[in-house]
């Protein structure tokens, strides 16, 4: 399932570690936003990994699950394009 991940991490070093972890699971679509196609197990693994990297007193990470119907309605304005699961380009 498409999972949109956004984050606000105060420390530059922690922010880089979070971004690198997210790159293992998906693709960056904006500076602090990633699109990841994950099953429930992968999402759990990602959340545990990210939780170990952030300071929960100052940082935040949000995970939004996007259903298949809603994923079909994804639209992009301006720079970039939406790529579905496994690199399929949705036009």
Where are these regions (language model features)?
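Short leucine-rich amphipathic alpha-helices used at interfaces
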Residues: 14, 20-21, 46, 77, ...
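Extended, hydrophobic alpha-helical segments
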Residues: 1-42
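Short, intrinsically disordered low-complexity segments
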Residues: 30, 35-60
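A broad, low-specificity signal for short, low-complexity segments enriched in glycine/proline
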Residues: 22-26, 50-51, 71
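C-terminal structural segments of small proteins and small subunits
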Residues: 52-91
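Intrinsically disordered, low-complexity sequence elements enriched in Ser/Thr/Gly/Pro
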Residues: 12-13, 25, 45, 60-63, ...
